[in-house]
Amino acid sequence: MNESYRCQTSTWVERGSSATMGAVLFGAGLLGNLLALVLLARSGLGSCRPGPLHPPPSVFYVLVCGLTVTDLLGKCLISPMVLAAYAQNQSLKELLPASGNQLCETFAFLMSFFGLASTLQLLAMAVECWLSLGHPFFYQRHVTLRRGVLVAPVVAAFCLAFCALPFAGFGKFVQYCPGTWCFIQMIHKERSFSVIGFSVLYSSLMALLVLATVVCNLGAMYNLYDMHRRQRHYPHRCSRDRAQSGSDYRHGSLHPLEELDHFVLLALMTVLFTMCSLPLIYRAYYGAFKLENKAEGDSEDLQALRFLSVISIVDPWIFIIFRTSVFRMLFHKVFTRPLIYRNWSSHSQQSNVESTL
């Protein structure tokens, strides 16, 4: 057998490995996503009944719900297999020996599926935010609730077809050290195009999605900054323009403090998302194009995969918990109240000077 990985055929968990990190990631992801769903349900954002007490959910929150459910399903389907392997001290291939390599292939398929699906949904949220802030006319005409609901099933169908390519012969799933996880094979001794090509294609697609998400978030951040700057210099004109443009569909009636909320939210999201995605992309390219065909970096691959899994943990805390009224009230008291007082003082001094003139 043409083995490129040290634990490719292992039947036990490598010595020195601990389930602590996997358990912590699973617990944090499960708690965060469940709390996010509870907050969504309590806020009534899941109700589609029109009316003053039950307003229809916005496209943004429909996308948040889809992302939260996707992350929760990924944690519940993938992490128990890792913890079971540690508990039994058996690799994924040995947990169900009668199934052969099917459990390992299923695990790798789920890993690639949920990693790609979450990234696509994050891009959809970034595009929605950028359009709503920078192109309100186009947003109000073309971005509808019905189309927002279709994002999750369309993403799932695409990821299902793309990540199933190794089952059709293009690409290969393999077991990585310490024997508790499987993923796309990124190194091959004979440099088979069907094996290396799929890993490069997957990482290239992830890189393009990350780049597009960062660009959209930077565009949204610039629009927020521009809105805040225009409102400071021309407050009456900005309010009149927003009312005429109809851009208050979602963000048009933003208070300056809410604009600051969105700015900080997008900045934090962009930094964390980029930091968590780049390690796996780098490892895929490194494994495909390095001169030596040995997989001596199994520990680095595992760390890169853990970084990628952190995205599904951070998502609910960033998109939902950060936006709750309690957290925002605390944020305003700590960070924005001095800013408000400073702006009010400067405005009062300017008014006094103008009155004396």
UniProtKB/Swiss-Prot annotation:
SUPFAM superfamilies cross-referenced by the UniProt entry: Family A G protein-coupled receptor-like
Listed InterPro entries: GPCR_Rhodpsn (IPR000276), GPCR_Rhodpsn_7TM (IPR017452), Pglndn_D_rcpt (IPR000376), Prostanoid_rcpt (IPR008365)
Segments crossing the lipid bilayer: 21-41, 59-79, 107-127, 150-170, 195-215, 262-282, 307-327
Cytoplasmic side, ranges: 42-58, 128-149, 216-261, 328-357
Disulfide bond among keywords: yes
Null mutant phenotype: Mutant mice show decreased susceptibility to passive cutaneous anaphylaxis associated with decreased mast cell degranulation.
PROSITE patterns: G_PROTEIN_RECEP_F1_2
Domain of life: Eukaryota
Pfam families referenced in this protein's UniProt entry, alphabetically: 7tm_1
Disulfide bonds: C104-C182
Glycosylation sites: N2, N89
GO cellular component: plasma membrane
Cellular compartments annotated: Cell membrane
Topological category with respect to the lipid bilayer: Multi-pass membrane protein
Record's keyword annotation contains Oxidoreductase: no
Gene3D superfamilies noted in UniProt: Rhodopsin 7-helix transmembrane proteins
Family affiliation: Belongs to the G-protein coupled receptor 1 family.
Protein name from the UniProt record: Prostaglandin D2 receptor
Species the sequence originates in: Mus musculus
Gene name for this UniProt entry: Ptgdr
